[in-house]
Amino acid sequence: LDSNRIEDLSPLGRLTGVNDMSLGTNQIRDVFPLRRLIRMVKLNLSNNEIRDLGPLVKLIALEELNFNRNDVSSLAFVANMQKLRVLNCSTNLIEDISPLLDLPALTRVSLQGNPLSDKAKAHARELIDRGVTVIAPQ
């Protein structure tokens, strides 16, 4: 569903059996309709107009999540995503990455293009020490 000028995700909210969805390069602002897609394992929301991914908090089966090139400022919604392995949240408005510290399956995270705080940069070093591949500004 990439590059289709999609704005309204309401029709997709009924696809509760879907486990892989790519919605990159659209005009999405509201992800609330995706909140029931709890079987989702891989989700691409890159290059949209999203500010809040909070409605995804119950998508705890996610293993790969890409939302680069949006306007997201908080990672709090990933706190319970224990299966999340790969996260691309580059080019957003993220300053705090502390929710990533409690994700045991995380192997790769892309953070470049975010206004990371000094504390977030220290957290990135902690992730690297744990063996996570971190792509971030120095």
Annotate each predicted stretch with a short phrase:
Residues L1-E7, P11-E95, P99-A122, I128-Q138:
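Concave beta-strand-loop units of leucine-rich repeat
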